[in-house]
């Protein structure tokens, strides 16, 4: 393809609303354009990258035995009402009514639709297992869409759904999809890690997230340096260590005027934060609950929500805090907490040690509080966020906390949807059984952005070869030089015959402009044809990833290019 015929509107500056590097570079490279908040148009170059990701995903899904379908984006409310998600999914589900006053939504996911499809077709165990997938546009009405393609409202996703006779069959389907995901992200040239994860609103008993490793990632991972354990910090277990502090003395009230936070109380009383207990108040499915963690710890709200089995968990408002405790925010504590009947504490707090807690009284705390003696704790559980100082819960080794971007998620759904929607079949004995489900998602458009978050430099995008819109940027420095133009056309034909996508820059622009644009769009292989080089019988080749330049002979170019390209691919681990 000739650049002069392409629509590639590159920009020198990023838009003011672009926060992360992928958003900035996708816009600057002319790959996406914003239509409205969280909704983007894929330009020709961006669509090429998107389609390349989708092609690899499709190949590996087919290889794993899944079959492609295409389901409607518009979904009727009655299916969501069957599973109860119409009420509980929240405002991210965009709902509307048609002219006949029937309720619908734009699908953020398709568990209900696929279950309805399969329950209407499958009658016998002989028809199972089934694994169906689609690559489709989804819509989630994010409250704060941001970061371009990273957290948009409209996005392209691959979602697959497996249906099996029993749990062992579901386990096999899960393994097959897990292996397919490993192949997909390896083929895309991404540095990634599969981690244990919380299943969230999708539900199910077990799941893994596939994370692209990037310093700009929104997620934090807990990764053991000594064994294979890896988990999202939301899921990561913390091994409780017994408290060795002295037993509590007599409880005593202490004034703490104006000290609302752990830091302020710690400074005012001259004690370390690990001698204090945070009392955090929530509303869980309409019911007030309290959660306690040590003052220097962070509560893991996902663990609390799972412990409660709650569909919703929201931090209490200042008005609710005052109504339940009789004190403003910052002075809540577990002793005499009459407005909250359910109180849970992290395992680290179990025992007779004396703690400093809020007194449920303005400007006042309590010293020497024993949770065993002085508070009514319903249960002790692992409620805190893991830190780098905690040991691995599997082997006791050291834990690192790298950042990651979620690009895939695989779930063992079990009977969550099939039971509520009565998706059944007859087994060998003619007995009705409920299908066991799994679901498997990949954010196709998010992969493009995540790839750029992981692979960029000060000059632009550094695409891995499998994702690059054009693998080869062939820069013809002087289009008016007939000899150079002829040689460029010859090289272009050879490369295309070899199966490479080539963008021949034949524009009437200064060489500096061509070099900058080639770096910006991220083609992994750059070839430069200049009059001086051709006079010496060479073509300059640049490895976009390393920046290393070399000269390839015009005579024998084919073999020289193949060898050079093999070296570039090796650097990518491909």
Curated annotation (Swiss-Prot):
InterPro entries: aa-tRNA-synt_IIb, aa-tRNA-synth_II, aa-tRNA-synth_II/BPL/LPL, Anticodon-bd, Anticodon-bd_dom_sf, Pro-tRNA-ligase_IIa, Pro-tRNA-synth_IIa_bac-type, Pro-tRNA-Synthase_IIa_type1. PROSITE patterns: AA_TRNA_LIGASE_II. GO terms for molecular function: aminoacyl-tRNA deacylase activity; ATP binding; proline-tRNA ligase activity. One of its GO terms (cellular component) is cytosol. The keyword Protein biosynthesis applies. NCBIfam families: PRK09194.1, proS_fam_II. Consists of three domains: the N-terminal catalytic domain, the editing domain and the C-terminal anticodon-binding domain. This is Proline--tRNA ligase. It comes from Nitratidesulfovibrio vulgaris (strain ATCC 29579 / DSM 644 / CCUG 34227 / NCIMB 8303 / VKM B-1760 / Hildenborough).
